[in-house]
Amino acid sequence: WQDLNFQTVELKQVIRQKNPEFIHELNKARIGDYSCVHYFNTHCQKTLFENGIILTATNRKAEQINHDRLSKIPYKAKVYHSRIVGDVKNSDKPTLDELHLKIGARVMVLMNDTEQNLYQNGSFGKVYKLEDESVTVILDTNKTLVTFGYHEWAIENYVLSKRKEEDIEDNHLSKEKVGAFYQIPLKLAYAITMHKSQGQTYDQVNLIPYS
């Protein structure tokens, strides 16, 4: 590890925020300076933003909120069950085995559109139509209707093997497909974890930092 001589780079330019006072307090939080707490406590409100996304500390809390919000939609839920092939552990699963959806439910996309770039992993929308093998969503960003069928997530393990080239033998690390997980690439998105929200920009945020 030491022989690799990695170079450390510190990013100092803030792109997502413009308010210098807000940036200053965020930097305090980043380094663990407790004096920032007063600023945040005096610049927040206790009433939830009606259209703001809820960020939680744990998946369990997010799932609880999503279940509660889904139950308030006056339509019958449709359940999509995952399909598993090969060796797939619970920790390998990118989403739920049972996906409960209703017309009008808020959802997040869990894959990238590599062909038309209409959506990315993390895009939001609302359920427009439910069918046996697919779900149609109207996207927030461009109001486009997109139909999502079952998507395959390949489950891979790393394998260490010997490789010999020109009389030199060394170890070679490669990927090996051991299974596949199939599910509709959507999840309820009234609430998501802070981890899942990284890299996203939101107009309004409701923060629940406890589990």
Task: Say what each PLM segment does.
Residues 1-211:
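Conserved ATP-binding/catalytic motifs of P-loop helicase motor domains
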